[in-house]
Amino acid sequence: MVMLCSLMAVCSVSARISRREGMDGQAAIYRLPLFERAVCCTKYFEGWHSEKHHPYVGWGHKILPDERYSARTMTKRQADVLLRKDLRKFCAMFRQFGKDSLLLATLAYNVGPYRLLGSKTIPKSTLIKKLEAGDRNIYHEYIAFCSYKGKRHAMRSEEHTS
């Protein structure tokens, strides 16, 4: 289920890694710890954010009101450190979900944690409600978040309706 999304991501990233490192990319990425895989996949799919992507910098970090980052001066190293810090923060936020915490952290990095956890104005997601009830069959709830600029990705809409 959820592994299908992860597998598709890993295959794309694997191809990129194999070209860069001159080795079998799939084998290379599977040798990485899960957190490192999440970092690689996030970098690959987020891409680099320049000034035109404000308030996002680096590999998709959203600048908070008290932060002073500039896309113009940010290095790849600084962005990598920031991405890892963000993912660790989200992993801690979802710690209660055990082995699903990294999956939820990467999703929260993309859609925001309150789209999952809820807030005063946003209800708690069905995905979180199912996990809290002990139901790990969350594939359809997970891919429901696969959209860009409010529109479902064409390759995902078929899976979501079937």
What is each of the regions a protein language model found here?
Residues M1-C11:
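Hydrophobic membrane-insertion alpha-helices, especially the h-region
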Residues S50-H53, F94-L103, E141:
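Surface-exposed patches in mature extracellular/periplasmic domains of secreted proteins
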Residues S12-H49, H61-R68, M74-M93, R115-E158, ...:
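Long, amphipathic alpha-helical surface segments
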Residues H54-Y56, H61:
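Early exported N-terminus immediately downstream of N-terminal targeting peptides
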Residues L102-R115:
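Short N-proximal segments of mature Sec-exported proteins
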